[in-house]
Amino acid sequence: MFNDIIVNVKGGSPPLIKILVKGAVSSSQMKYIQLPFIIILSILASCSDADFDIVIRNGTIIDGSGYAAYTSDIGIINDKIVKIGDLSKQTTKRTIDATNQVVSPGFIDSHTHAIRGIFDVPTAESSLLQGVTTLTDGNDGTSPHPIDAHFQKIENAKISPNWAVFVGQGTIRKEVMGLENRDPTTSELSEMELLVQEAMEDGALGISTGLFYIPGSFSLTSEVISLSKIAASYGGIYISHMREEAADVLKSVNETINIGLEAKIPVQITHHKIIGKENWGLSKETLRLVDDAIKGGLKVSIDQYPYTAS
């Protein structure tokens, strides 16, 4: 016959420690049981009393706010930063010495096509080893469909980085109209709007276009505005591979800004560049257009990739 000796550590429920002792336990025998209990409880208490789970000490912090780099400690509890400052007198379960190292938030890669490889290499070391912890996909008007099924696949794959997607205007158009080069009917436009609504409700960041590519190139500006209004109603953004990045780049920037104004949606001009040596210098004008739009109250941003493509 075994008797249970159950000890609650700091009032924990259910009990954290349970020992089975064969036969009755006399008071004289209890002293031999109490000593290991005391040791175990002391160890557990010392662990649970730590101020932080992790402290990153003496790192050069660049926090993304625009402020200059500074040296400090970072305290983490339950995977969340809870304090930044001098934590030299605080206790921690684990210490990371970041002396002469840079500590920053993980980078967000705002334009990827990582869906082409994320299921083959779910750990995504090529991104993580560069400090990129969030990948966005669904760019250039092409996205997974439907979004909710895609997120379930991502969840099942247990990928390492954070993951976000846009709903692609080209994907939605193709779903409703195929690759036909014409304007949508009223009912077709309504169907596309409903699909954008469903995607936003399933967690899309916003709507993307690839107006340089088929079938996005078949779409009038008014069609894009209608779909962007749906995304805007859910707090989404509009990100675009514009129609033209060469001689007519100014028209494309103006179109992109106009979509933002009409749909009342923040705008991101993706991989902005000027293609063709004969067009170099037009970036002065494109940036002026963007600056003017920002001064007028529209949220406009630009991303670029760090390699030659013009």
Q: Where are the regions that the model predicts?
A:
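C-terminal motif of bacterial Sec signal peptides marking the signal peptidase cleavage site
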Residues: 44-46
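Divalent-metal coordination cores built from histidine and acidic residues
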Residues: 98-103, 107-112, 120-209, 228-229, ...
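Histidine/acidic residue-rich metal-binding segments in metalloenzymes
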Residues: 184-209, 215-310
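Sec-dependent signal peptide recognition
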Residues: 31-38
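Histidine-centered catalytic micro-motifs
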Residues: 106-117, 238-244
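Histidine-rich, glycine-flanked metal-binding segment
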Residues: 51-54, 61-105
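Positively charged N-terminal leader segments that act as targeting/secretion signals
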Residues: 7-17, 23-25
